[in-house]
């Protein structure tokens, strides 16, 4: 009996399912049915499987596509190799979807950025560089999916996000040398101007922004998956989660700084709810000064430093989008296939 796969979870998790689904279509069933329970727009970035994907609310989906299938909901967090840190999300989905008995090599992403999002990314990055008087841009994603805003406080009980104090420190220090673009869907509470752009962009536009940037710095969240897929150098700081599970230690362009290595306890998400593990992990992203310095150095070692000069800056929200009436040139488009 043929299978239909249901994919759910956060954006990074959904993205990590794509390589295994592509392999399944190419090697097992070219007509495979994939049901998107979340983040359907991310499937559009895969030229291989985008025509095999249906949203949950598609009219007639059950009768027309599912009734004669075995319905499968792959759950990587319940895979022994995953919760014992033997595979990352990409490999875990591959084992579950393609029935690998041995741990497979990590499969590559095959992402396609459409022209609209490429243009958006290039325009925004160039605008921010010009505004801050810098020649290089760094995308900084400080918060993971567990972040919560409570009044003037931003907290992450899951221990995956940068502490607010360190967010300000990172932006201030990197802003001396680079145009900093903060990737966040939550407003940062502050009474002073941050030397960074905080654009309002959707997930596909962020793909374009990271593609046009020079470096990525982040935590256990979506942006690092984009950076890996788009061959961007990156620094990933982990706290409560294991880099072997959620990141790409084998990527030579990645610097992984494991802040929670000596103190974290595995939190069995989607298996059980371990309140003790969550409580013990919640401070896993508090940075000591020496760790903070390592983070900054990992960026400056790759990009170099720029001369200091005073720059007047204003908040950047959206980038100009080229039209047929523009007299200036459009940015260079990337190849259709962007391979990790």
Q: What is the meaning of each model-derived region?
A:
Residues 1-47:
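N-terminal pre-catalytic "stem/leader" segment of glycosyltransferase-like enzymes
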Residues 2, 137, 215, 315-317:
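Structural motif
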Residues 11, 15, 153-244:
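Donor-binding and catalytic core of enzymes assembling or modifying cell-surface/extracellular glycoconjugates
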Residues 145-152, 189-192, 265-266:
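Short acidic/His/Gly/Ser-rich catalytic and metal-binding motifs that mark active-site loops
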């Amino acid at each position: 009996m043929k299978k239909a796969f249901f994919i759910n979870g956060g954006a990074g998790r959904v993205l990590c399912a794509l390589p295994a689904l592509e392999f399944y279509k190419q090697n097992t069933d070219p007509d495979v049915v994939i049901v998107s329970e979340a983040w359907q727009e991310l499937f559009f970035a895969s030229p291989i499987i985008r025509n095999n994907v249906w949203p949950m609310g598609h009219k007639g989906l059950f009768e027309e596509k599912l009734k004669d299938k075995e319905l499968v909901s792959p759950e990587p967090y319940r895979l022994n190799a995953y919760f014992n840190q033997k595979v990352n999300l990409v490999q875990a989905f591959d084992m579950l979807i393609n029935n690998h008995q041995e741990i497979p090599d990590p499969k590559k992403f095959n992402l396609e950025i459409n022209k609209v999002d490429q243009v958006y990314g290039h325009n925004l990055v160039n605008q921010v560089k010009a505004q801050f008087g810098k020649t290089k841009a760094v995308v900084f994603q400080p918060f993971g999916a567990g972040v919560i805003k409570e009044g003037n406080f931003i907290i992450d009980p899951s221990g995956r996000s940068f502490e607010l104090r360190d967010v300000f420190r990172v932006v201030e220090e990197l802003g001396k040398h680079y145009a900093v673009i903060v990737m966040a869907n939550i407003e940062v509470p502050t009474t002073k101007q941050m030397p960074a752009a905080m654009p309002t962009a959707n997930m596909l536009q962020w793909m374009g922004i990271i593609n046009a940037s020079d470096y990525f710095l982040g935590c256990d969240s979506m942006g690092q998956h984009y950076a890996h897929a788009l061959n961007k150098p990156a620094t990933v700081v982990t706290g409560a989660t294991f880099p072997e599970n959620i990141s790409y230690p084998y990527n030579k362009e990645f610097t992984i700084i494991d802040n929670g290595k000596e103190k974290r306890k595995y939190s069995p998400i989607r298996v059980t709810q371990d309140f003790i593990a969550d409580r013990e992990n919640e401070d896993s992203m508090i940075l000591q000064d020496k760790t903070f310095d390592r983070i900054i150095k990992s960026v400056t070692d790759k990009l170099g430093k720029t001369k200091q000069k005073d720059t007047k800056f204003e908040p950047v929200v959206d980038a100009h989008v080229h039209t047929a009436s523009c007299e200036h040139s459009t940015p260079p488009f990337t190849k259709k296939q962007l391979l990790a």
